[in-house]
């Protein structure tokens, strides 16, 4: 890792900015939390498929198992969040609490991706093994599963609230901007 391209530093700064902004409470449309994890899944599968073209079903099974485990952890993490809802002219909005877990996930993902790419680019002998591919897929599954689980939890609670069967009854609606 003698020389990293300039876009890597720009990407790092962008990820830090996104992660820091998620540390503060924010008001979003209910579909917004699910967009980032879906993009994360697509980009990750594409990247891993190109990095490990010889990866077999065992690597994808490890990714799926890790994704399910990460999503479960993310679901339980978001379950304790106290959400607030508001309906305005732009539709339903949900106020999400500030949470540093996305910042940590983004930074861990950046480190893992940099490590994987560097190991392959420098032709490390262990990077060509099937075990490295399986571990790479599993790490990706965990890191993408956690935000996916949190997002699915938030979207599910928004749907329940919209249908009138919300468990958020004790949470006051937040004020309009």
Predicted features along the sequence, with ranges:
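Cytoplasmic-side transmembrane-helix entry/capping segments in multi-pass membrane proteins
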Residues: 28-41, 58-66, 92
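A cytosolic-side transmembrane-helix exit/cap motif
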Residues: 52-58, 78-91
């Amino acid at each position: 890792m003698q020389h990293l391209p300039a876009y890597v530093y720009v990407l790092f700064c962008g990820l830090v900015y996104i992660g820091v902004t998620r540390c503060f409470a924010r008001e979003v449309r209910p579909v917004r939390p699910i967009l980032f994890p879906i993009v994360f899944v697509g980009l990750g599968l594409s990247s891993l498929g190109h990095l490990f073209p010889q990866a077999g079903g065992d690597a994808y099974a490890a990714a799926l198992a890790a994704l399910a485990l990460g999503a479960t952890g993310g679901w339980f993490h978001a379950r304790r969040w106290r959400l607030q809802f508001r309906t305005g002219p732009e539709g339903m909005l949900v106020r999400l609490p500030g949470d540093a877990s996305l910042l940590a996930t983004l930074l861990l993902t950046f480190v893992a991706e940099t490590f994987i790419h560097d190991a392959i680019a420098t032709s490390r002998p262990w990077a060509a093994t099937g075990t490295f591919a399986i571990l790479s897929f599993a790490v990706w599954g965990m890191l993408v599963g956690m935000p996916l689980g949190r997002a699915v939890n938030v979207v599910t609670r928004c749907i329940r609230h919209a249908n009138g069967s919300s468990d958020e009854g004790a949470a006051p609606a937040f004020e309009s901007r």
